[in-house]
Amino acid sequence: TRYVMMFYYPQDTTLDMGPTCVVPQSQYLPRREVEQTRAEFDRLSRAGLNKIRDQLLAKTMTPQESEKAVKAVYKETAEKHPELAKKNKTLEKLWKDKRVPLVGPAGTLVFVHFDIVHARYSSNELGLPRHMVKFLFTRNNDPVKPSWNHADPDWKQEETSVSSEIMKPVWLDLWNWHLGNKQSNENTITSVKSLCDRLKDSNDELAVSAAYELAKSDEGVELLIEIFNSDDTNLRSIAAYGLRAAGQRSLDYLAPLIDKEDPQKVARVIDVLGDIGPPADSLLEPVIKAASSQSVVVRRYAVEAVGLIAQQQVKCSRALIEQLENALKDEDAIVRRNGAFSIAQLGDKVCSELVVDGLIENLQDWHHHVRGWSIEALQRLENERALKAAIKYLNHTRWDAYPKSGDRTVTDQVMRLEDPVR
């Protein structure tokens, strides 16, 4: 768990005010069938939605009118494709039935995993203001030992549901990760063939748990690599979970893939290496090199991954620092954001005059995530000029009054300020 969110309610929030809700234990499931069905439904609705977007940009339609128009577009799509609409509704209901509404008095704080499924629970029937502030917390470093009053190294499974039993390999791996152990030493007794069948199951829990089981043996990792390299986008992400869990065991298989010509494949490999973190430090050099790729997608993942992989190094190379200096000036907003993120992770180990200059300049960036990570990074450099710039900025702003200008759909194209919002 590298990211945690905190939800804060500044007012009393009841069920009839439309609170936020979460789906417990959903953070490790990709919801493939739901997302695929929803994506197809959105694709069929795209023409109507684009028309509404264009009218909003031209200011010939109000936001209130657009809400009604969007509902009308989806209704029309459902009438034209009733079977798809029925399937979509059925799949969504399976998740909606597991939702837990977050209600409470003013001052309520809720801490949740960054990837947990969360959304509005219901409409605001009272019409009263219902504000909620989100805070994002990030680890400075992956754990090397327990951070709590820890006595028993064994994982204790409190729940006895079928779902919890299926997901036990996942919980056990995460438990070991939080203890600072590199990977689980528990050997699987399930055959690789049986696990392969489970990996290909449409049930997310069965598939993900199988990937974690396969990660425990060399034969299993070979199978995960084969699937990871396949054209089956439905299974590649599941295989990636297993390769992350395999840690150092997967590095010899991933190393030859970093130099492939396909930028999408290279990006996927680097993404896994970043998820593995410090245990992947033997491949840090090619990841640093990839940070100057012509592909914006590869640059994004590489610039982020260097901060995760190098976090436990005593000293960072000049080549790494130069790539981060360049990242802060990249034409792509996501690369600049990830550059600031990695600098915040690595702190004074990557401090240079150009790093400080770049971060100070990016305090005025159009993308709110670039601004946010830049101010965070300046405070972690242990540099007098950086700290003075951070204090000056915080004194002037106190609160970021700029709009969330970076909330745009991320594509494989360079993101610029002047591009139309999509």
Positions of the model-derived regions?
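Short, charged, solvent-exposed linker or helix-capping segments at domain edges/interfaces
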Residues: 18-19, 33, 145-147, 381, ...
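Amphipathic alpha-helical scaffolding segments comprising HEAT/armadillo-like alpha-solenoid repeats
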Residues: 188-199, 217-229, 248-259, 278-292, ...
